[in-house]
Each structure stands twice: as structure tokens, then as C-alpha cells.
From Swiss-Prot:
The lineage of its organism: Bacteria, Pseudomonadati, Pseudomonadota, Gammaproteobacteria, Pseudomonadales. Keywords: Amino-acid biosynthesis, Cytoplasm, NADP, Oxidoreductase, Proline biosynthesis. Belongs to the gamma-glutamyl phosphate reductase family. It comes from Pseudomonas putida (strain W619). It is found in: Cytoplasm. This is Gamma-glutamyl phosphate reductase.
């Protein structure tokens, strides 16, 4: 009898839960050995990876996949190099598991502190890019978690080949293969099953388009770490250094259009708009960026009219909306109303205004005189990230190794009794 999707996912979940207990107590040396061995296995399996990836690319071309998606799907030699390097870099990162902090004596004589421990089993749901398999697996492994990876159907052969290499590394380190499992069915029911198994899965991390993330957020019976959009703003304030503003805003938009930290809306204080916008527009237009502006913006530069929808839009493209605002309060109001609570930056030399902006803008990252594209785990010193969270529970901002752990209280006594004096 053919195994149903639900039975298959239950089997994966049960195996992951059992494996999570093993990886949670694995030593740092053992986890690092698995990561290094997985890197060696990837290096030795380049031909296998290329053949599996070509199967996915051929199917994608036959199914009319867009060129941009085919590019994201491709495992070029350089990308395989990057995956190998990524595994070795994660192996070199400090291990957060087992760290104890804030240990202190209480009046009763007991000691109380906090220990960092793995979350348990993490389900990762993602689209297109097979290198996410390595990113997710390596971070979960190093942080002492088991993981179930459900990639897009368009990358199924690539993901299987990558998972095989990871499991070779696990075996070499004496760890169970179920520490990292790839869902091998392309049936969409697998996603519904994965997000509905709180007895086996502790948290879900979705990485993909808005539709995928909205569905998972709505239907999941398991906690979700996510962000929906990256509608990031740069506000050029009254006391801005204009040259700094031109450089920061240009980099925030043009570093890479397709990242969630790219600036999508530029806000400019009315007191500097006339001196700032013409030169800013010239630089963007030379780069081929389409500008959409409010009425006050279009009185100063050539731009298409911005609609209400533009303020809500994550373009992920060479398009920028611009609004002239009355001042700091209106800029903060605009960001908190239209933004996605991801990353927002102020350009100013006025420390009081900078502090107000950072205190009142309700985003995972707030910046001063810094391009929003710096919102990245590597740039923050995390070494790597599994994604960026705009939630306030459990993690917020780039989620690295520490974000894949939680804390439990550690209490040490010597026979003290509550309600009685220590003997």
C-alpha cells in the first residue's frame, strides 16, 4: 500500500524529534566535524550536484520558468564554492548552546541564571534557491536543532543531492541522518502537514513570496518566524549632511534591488527637499531607477505620480517612491503606517532627532546614516542568518545561531527550603 503524504510527514516528524534529542547533546567538536565533513562531501560530489541541478533546470525550462527564477535555481561552480565556504564558516562560529549567563545569588542562597538551549525541531519552507538548503541545514545543525527542509518542487533533485552530502557529513561525525531531512515529495499537502505537527515540530521558518508566508502564518499550528515584506525607508531629515544623504540613499536602493533590505521609499524633509532632490534624482536616473513621487516631489523633479499603493509596495526592482514630508513626526508616522517593520534609516547630524527616530520607529532594525541594505546577519556579525524576522516574538531582525536557540532557567541550591531559613 502506498504511504500517504500525512503518514510520510508523520514519519519524518517522528524521526526528527528523536534526532533532535541526539543533536541537542552533541559536542561543539562533533557538530563542527559534521559540518566540515559535509563540506568535503559537497566538494567531492560536484558532478552529482551538477547533474541533479541540470534535471531541475531542464524541467524549469520545459515548464516556462522565468529567466530570473532559472538563475536563482542554478548551482554554478561559484555557488557550489559558496556553499562549501558557508559550511566551513558556520563551523568556525561560536556555539551558543550551553552558554550560561546572569548567574547570581538570591537572598535565599540559591543561584539563578539562564542557559541557552536548542529549540528542538525546525521546519524550513522555501522556494527556488537550492543553496538555502545548505544555509538552513548548517545553522540548524550548529545550533543543536534537527530540521525538516521543504524546498520548492522546481529544485527537488538539487535539494536531494545536497541533503545526501549533508547526511554523509552527519554519518562521519556519528550523528543520525534524521538531524537533516529533506521532504522528497512535491505534493503540496506536505506543507500543510509540516505546519500542523506541534508534537514533532517546534517552529516553522518560511522563506519565499508573500502568498506562501501569508498562508503559513494563517494556517500553522506551530510558531512561525517570518517577515512578509521589506518595505524599507530612508528619511533625509532637516539636519542631514546632503552629500552623506545622496550616497547612503543611492546605496540603499541600488546595492541589490531584489533583497528585502533595499530601500523602497525615500522620505525627504521639506526644508532640504529643494537642495537634495534634484541631485538625488539625477543619480538615480543615470542608474535607470524609475522614480514615483508625491505632488511636492514632482514640483522639484521629474517623476511619475505616486499612488497610495506605491507606499505599500515592496518593488524588489529599479523603482523608488519619494515623498516630501513636513518633518520628523510625519516621517515616523508614514513609516509606522506604511512600512513592514523591517529596516528604516534616518540621515541626520542632529543626535536628538536620531534618538527620537530610533525610539519611535517600530521596526526590527533602525539605523542612523546607514543604508538599509546593511540589514543582514553577516553584516551584523552573526556570521550567517536563516532569515529576517519582523515579529516581536521570539526573534526580531536577522536570525542567526542564537535566534535558533532559547533560554531556560538554571537554579543551583544546596538544600535550601522555601519558607524556611537556610540551614
Amino acid at each position: 500500500m502506498t504511504e500517504s503524504v500525512l503518514d510520510y510527514m508523520t514519519r519524518l516528524g517522528r524521526a526528527a524529534r528523536q534526532a533532535s534529542r541526539v543533536i541537542a547533546r552533541a559536542s561543539t567538536a562533533q557538530k563542527n566535524r559534521a559540518l566540515q565533513a559535509a563540506a568535503d562531501a559537497l566538494d567531492a560530489a560536484r558532478a552529482e550536484l551538477a547533474a541533479a541541478n541540470e534535471q531541475d533546470l531542464a524541467a524549469g525550462r520545459a515548464n516556462g520558468l522565468e529567466p530570473a527564477l532559472l538563475d536563482r535555481l542554478a548551482l554554478t561552480p561559484a555557488r557550489i564554492d559558496g556553499m562549501i565556504t558557508g559550511l566551513r564558516q558556520v563551523a568556525s562560529l561560536p556555539d551558543p548552546v550551553g552558554a550560561i549567563r546572569d548567574m547570581s545569588y538570591r537572598p535565599s542562597g540559591i543561584q539563578v541564571g539562564k542557559m541557552r538551549v536548542p529549540l528542538g525541531v525546525i521546519g524550513i519552507i522555501y522556494e527556488s534557491r537550492p543553496n538555502v538548503t545548505i544555509d538552513a541545514a548548517s545553522l540548524c545543525l550548529k545550533s543543536g536543532n534537527a530540521t525538516i527542509l521543504r524546498g520548492g518542487s522546481e529544485a527537488i533533485h538539487s535539494n536531494r543531492a545536497i541533503a545526501t552530502c549533508i547526511q554523509r557529513g552527519l554519518a562521519e561525525a556519528g550523528l543520525p541522518a534524521a538531524v537533516v531531512q529533506v521532504v522528497e515529495t512535491t505534493d503540496r499537502e506536505a506543507v500543510g502537514a509540516l505546519i500542523s505537527m506541534p508534537e514533532f515540530v517546534d517552529v516553522i521558518v518560511p522563506r519565499g513570496g508573500r502568498g506562501l508566508i501569508e498562508r503559513i502564518s494563517r494556517d500553522a499550528r506551530v510558531p512561525v518566524i517570518k517577515h512578509l515584506d521589506g518595505i524599507c525607508h530612508v528619511y533625509v531629515a532637516e539636519h542631514a549632511d546632503l552629500d552623506k544623504g545622496w550616497r547612503v540613499a543611492f546605496n540603499a536602493k541600488t546595492y541589490r534591488y531584489g533583497i528585502c533590505g533595499a530601500m523602497e521609499t525615500l522620505l525627504v524633509d521639506q526644508r532640504v527637499a529643494e537642495g537634495f532632490l534634484p541631485e538625488m534624482a539625477r543619480r538615480f536616473q543615470e542608474k535607470g531607477v524609475e522614480l514615483r513621487g508625491c505632488e511636492r516631489t514632482r514640483a522639484l523633479i521629474e517623476a511619475k505620480p505616486a499612488s497610495e499603493d506605491d507606499w505599500h509596495t515592496e518593488y524588489l526592482d529599479a523603482i523608488l517612491s519619494i515623498r516630501v514630508v513636513d518633518g520628523l513626526d510625519q516621517a515616523i508616522e508614514h513609516i509606522n503606517h506604511y512600512g513592514s517593520h523591517h529596516t528604516d534609516s534616518i540621515i541626520t547630524e542632529h543626535q536628538g532627532q536620531a534618538r527620537q527616530f530610533m525610539a519611535e520607529v517600530d521596526s526590527a532594525s533602525v539605523m542612523l546614516n546607514t543604508p538599509t541594505c546593511f540589514a543582514d546577519g553577516f553584516e551584523y556579525g552573526l556570521g550567517a542568518e536563516i532569515g529576517i524576522s519582523t515579529d516581536k516574538l521570539h526573534a526580531r531582525g536577522p536570525v542567526g545561531l542564537e535566534g535558533l536557540t532559547c533560554e531556560k532557567y538554571v537554579v543551583i541550591g544546596d538544600g535550601q527550603l522555601r519558607g524556611q531559613e537556610s540551614c
